[in-house]
């Protein structure tokens, strides 16, 4: 009698199915109930992610399209770098338009054109969580709130949280307005945080998630010029740490990235001479980092031939000594510049339009996105209701002044 795959030992079935590409995981789970259950086991997920990370040594990224996310792989071999469109993740009804995507250690925070809701999504596990926004602030169609997703390590599991904040310095207002709030995925509650910042975080500078916390380029509030520090939000204590120094403090454009979910990389662009317009790039990588301390080591220095702009998003391959940065100079196409120790290597067409937003890195994650238990809904406290009402009234007053 012929042996079917269902008759094979569980360990062998795991080994076979762990070779399924990431883009085909949804179809595999729908094939049969036993495969779906097996794919959710911790042993299978660790094996599958391990194979996906090492297979062909590819860098994975997702590009935002109106209703789907395209999965793109980049292979850097030093001779013939290449990109490949691997497929698409689709989870939203056509009525929902993806406005922006932010990647946090395998979780994707999708900001929608619908200003009333956002969604946190784990494409690898096929899990998503819709969150109702308490107050939308989008002057001229631009969401001015800043977002971060992270987690607090508990004894038995990771508790996922969403940080949302607004630090307003509009000249029409008589004084600065700050609103920091956090959403707990376990309790389904919003909490207004008591934070008065002495720092400034620019809306245009991308954040980086590392080991459950989030880092931004930042500077002292009453100073002018470039961001010359970084700052971390600790999702366990629900507090910001102190301003941490960058390796070069003055006169640099700054962009952050993550190296294998273990280190931070900072890209610094600065003038070679005070009175010239010749620039160079430096990339530094952390040797130690936590909420309250950081140390850096220089990784790569690049000249500007051919001239490239400072990318808001970039990647680093530490082993191959390679930098990959996005090039927006040939709208509507989007390219990836690849530069190594020996100089410029290749300019690759990513095959997606800039109108679909810049890609972000993607690393599969085992972080579970819990759904609220319908019979255990907790009501917001009266104190939180008052705090929310006060902030809503103040922000509404500012909106009238600036509109």
Swiss-Prot record:
Xref: Pfam families: F-box, FBA_1
InterPro entries: F-box-assoc_dom_typ1, F-box-assoc_interact_dom, F-box-like_dom_sf, F-box_dom, SCF_F-box_component
Entries under Gene3D superfamilies matching the protein: 1.20.1280.50
CDD domains for this protein: F-box_AtFBW1-like
SMART domains: FBOX (SM00256)
F-box domain residues: 2-47
NCBIfam families named in the record: F_box_assoc_1
Protein name: Putative F-box protein At5g41500
């Amino acid at each position: 009698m012929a042996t079917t795959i269902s008759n094979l030992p569980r360990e062998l079935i795991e080994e076979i199915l762990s070779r399924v590409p990431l883009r085909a995981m949804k179809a595999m789970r729908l094939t049969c109930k036993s495969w779906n259950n097996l794919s959710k086991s911790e042993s299978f997920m660790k094996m599958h992610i391990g194979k996906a990370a090492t297979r062909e040594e590819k860098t994975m990224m997702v590009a935002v399209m109106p209703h789907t996310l395209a999965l793109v792989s980049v292979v850097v071999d030093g001779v013939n770098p290449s990109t490949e469109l691997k497929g698409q993740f689709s989870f939203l009804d056509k009525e929902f338009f993806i406005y922006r995507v932010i990647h946090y250690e395998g979780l994707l925070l999708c900001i929608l054109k619908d200003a009333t809701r956002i969604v946190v999504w784990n494409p690898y596990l096929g899990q998503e969580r819709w969150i109702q926004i308490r107050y939308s602030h989008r002057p001229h169609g631009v969401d001015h709130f800043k977002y971060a997703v992270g987690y607090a390590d508990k004894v038995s599991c990771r508790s996922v949280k969403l940080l949302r904040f607004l630090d307003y310095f509009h000249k029409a207002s008589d004084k600065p307005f700050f609103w920091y709030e956090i959403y707990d995925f376990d309790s389904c509650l919003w909490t207004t945080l008591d934070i008065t910042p002495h720092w400034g975080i620019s809306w245009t500078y991308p954040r980086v998630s590392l080991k459950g916390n989030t880092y931004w380029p930042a500077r002292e509030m009453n100073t002018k010029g470039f961001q010359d520090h970084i700052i971390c939000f600790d999702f366990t204590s629900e507090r910001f740490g102190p301003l941490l120094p960058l390796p070069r403090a003055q006169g640099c454009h700054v962009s952050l990235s993550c190296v294998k979910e273990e280190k931070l990389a900072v890209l610094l662009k600065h003038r070679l001479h005070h009175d010239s317009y010749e620039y160079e790039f430096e990339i530094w990588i952390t040797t130690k980092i936590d909420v309250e301390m950081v140390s850096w080591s220089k990784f790569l220095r690049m000249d500007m031939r051919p001239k490239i702009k400072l990318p808001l998003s970039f990647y680093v391959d530490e082993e191959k000594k390679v930098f990959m940065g996005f090039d927006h100079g040939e709208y509507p196409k989007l390219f990836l510049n690849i530069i190594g120790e020996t100089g410029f290597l290749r300019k690759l067409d990513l095959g997606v339009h800039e109108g679909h937003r810049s890609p972000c890195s993607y690393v599969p994650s085992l972080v579970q996105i819990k759904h609220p238990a319908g019979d255990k809904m907790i009501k917001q406290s009266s104190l939180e209701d008052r705090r929310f009402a006060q902030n809503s009234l103040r922000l509404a007053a500012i909106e009238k002044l600036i509109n």
